Amino acid sequence: MERIIMHYDMDAFYASIEINRNPKLKNKPLVVGENIVTTASYEARKYDIHSAMKVSDAKLLCPKLIVLPVDKTEYIRISNEIHNLILKITNKVEFVATDEGYIDLTDVIKPENKKAFVIKFKQRIKELTNLTCSVGIGFNKLSAKIASDINKPFGFFIFENEEEFIKHISDKKIKIIPGVGKKFFEILKNDKIFYVKDIFKYPLDYLVKKYGKSRGENLYCSVRGIDFDEVEYQREIYSIGNEETFLIPLQNNSEIIREFNSLFEYTFERLLKNNVFTQSITIKMRYTSFKTYTKSKKLKFSTRSKDFLYNEMFELINSFEKEDEVRLLGVYFGDIKKSNLVQLALNKNL
């Protein structure tokens, strides 16, 4: 059976949420971020402003640029609403970020109903959040991802098969292929490889020898629409966690606690959403030196008490010796159980 894979991507997610909160910002160039741009509105992108750019550089490109602070609590709340909506359709979902994910629809819809499903899906997202998303449907994750980028924003595109996929992308610049970033694109340009069709000139062994096994195989397979990656949904939950890498490292304890609070809220929401309990907690911290440390604690009983878990994790994070600025922070609940063993024991003895 041919797979039906969908990729959705919320349009300028953070910026669009801020416009929803303040409609006067509509059609104005704005970015969300403090020192670094995390999201730019489509009006700001007309000035070549993009994510990961310094806010100071963005202001040089657009002196009238509106800069708003990041409100992760609100963004995560809305992201959770979207996740809950999708999980009512199927559990075969891989959420790759707060604003995008892959959905395996193979067992959900008939092939002839792809377009109708996409239109209904986009409508449901709009009704729920007043936000728009771009959607792609393909025969694997690669084709779905590329399809979702074709008619952004608020568009959709469907690849029915490999032949259609190859025909569509052959004349596109090679950077359309996932994994071809700015640096690799420059390397390929120096080798006179500008377009997807240029890759077809070379056999697999040449590409592997020239660019390494991972890059070479990715180029060879991707231009042909070959991708065997599965949508990585969790069949059995053993742990629930989230981590974040910071473009600007966290410099002091107040910044660390601020980000910890945000990660804890998001991770705890996932614990509740999955209707499970935890009996161990873990904090992961990576410094700018790339030294990585984890600290864990086994709890005396399984629980999903928010206050209890927060206090235990707060103690744990404060036990770290701050060697350097923090580049990555992670929060995890482990030893997941479907029931509260302490409560079951109490009920049994009543």
From Swiss-Prot:
Q: Which cofactor does it need?
A: Mg(2+)
Instruction: Check the record and name the Gene3D superfamilies matching this protein.
Output: 3.30.70.270, 3.40.1170.60, 5' to 3' exonuclease, C-terminal subdomain (1.10.150.20), DNA polymerase, Y-family, little finger domain (3.30.1490.100)
Per its UniProt record, what InterPro entries does this chain match? DNA/RNA_pol_sf, DNA_pol_Y-fam_lit_finger_sf, DNA_pol_Y-fam_little_finger, DNA_polymerase-Y, DNApol_IV, Rev_trsase/Diguanyl_cyclase, UmuC
* One of the protein's GO biological processes: SOS response
- Extract one GO molecular function annotation from the record: damaged DNA binding
Domain UmuC, by residue range, is 5-181
The residues that the entry says bind Mg(2+) are 9, 99
Its principal location?
cytoplasm
Name the Pfam families on file: IMS, IMS_C
Catalyses: DNA(n) + a 2'-deoxyribonucleoside 5'-triphosphate = DNA(n+1) + diphosphate
Q: Where in the cell is it found?
A: Cytoplasm
Q: Which UniProt keywords apply?
A: Cytoplasm, DNA damage, DNA repair, DNA replication, DNA-binding, DNA-directed DNA polymerase, Magnesium, Metal-binding, Mutator protein, Nucleotidyltransferase, Transferase
* Catalytic residues in the record: 100
One GO cellular component assignment for this chain's record is: cytoplasm
Using the chain's own numbering, where are the disulfide bonds? none
NCBIfam families, sorted: PRK02406.1
* Assembly with partners or alone: Monomer.
Say what the protein does. Poorly processive, error-prone DNA polymerase involved in untargeted mutagenesis. Copies undamaged DNA at stalled replication forks, which arise in vivo from mismatched or misaligned primer ends. These misaligned primers can be extended by PolIV. Exhibits no 3'-5' exonuclease (proofreading) activity. May be involved in translesional synthesis, in conjunction with the beta clamp from PolIII.
Under what name is this protein listed?
DNA polymerase IV
Name the gene: dinB
